[in-house]
Amino acid sequence: MAEMKNTRLELCNRIRMEAEHTEDTGFPLDVFPQNVQSIILDMTKYENYKIEFIATSMLSAVSAALGGTYRIRIKGDWQSNGTLYVILIGRPGLGKTPPLEAAFRPIRKHDYALFKAYEAEMEAWKAAGENGRKPVLKRTIVSDFTPESLMLTHNNNPRSVVILVDEIMGMFNSVNRYTNGQLIEQLLTAWSGGALDVTRVSNTIPVHIEHPCINIIGGTQTKRVHELLRKGFEENGLLDRILFVLPKSPEISPWINRDDDGEMTSLAAARWERILDKVFALEYDTEEIGRASCRVRV
């Protein structure tokens, strides 16, 4: 029964992709599971998103939610994670931010639930005379941060963190101006699956992250991409780690008002939230402090 349902969905998706000229974009939508393809097609149709932007943002969101739950065995003992560094590129007004926010909305909701739980734990801790272990705030999304605060956030949530910024060039400019490339070195190490160690006078307890998982996603304008070449990122290998997303067409599809726009958008968003909830439900076990036990897939 499930196989028949999936076959029908696959046929429906193919018909929709042909009718909506999805192949003209050159985007390989067929690499996604059929139910995710259906959600992407709905969001593209009813929200007027660029398929390249919404699909890649959703892929990044899954990577952030999955985190270090699974690791990839590349060859022998060589393992890495599913980290993605993504930059959405387009002229002003092309619609980079809305699909990015739509893809990560369930993660923001998850973070908000963690924040409310943290508030309750802090109140209980203070009411108990501040005895016992002080609660820590766990979250996945970070936007405004320093290299040190990023590492502390990741230490509190060893599963993963994602740097999500609307204009990513601002982050790179701040990195070079204030941290002398410290964050870039950490990102290079994390992308390769190496452990991170941070020792600061301001923090008496050193931070050690055995299996870091730091995702990055943000947008930038077409005319600003060249700025990355001026920062030495080509020489240190950062550019080779970035997935650049530039739609083939610089135009936005004509806006069509439909009576069921709101209903269909809500249904697609709810289906997407259920998928990410299932990803978050995957256990990330810690055997001992600073050492995570991960599943490995070839």
Roles of regions detected by a PLM:
Residues 1-295:
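Phosphate-handling catalytic cores of nucleic-acid transaction enzymes
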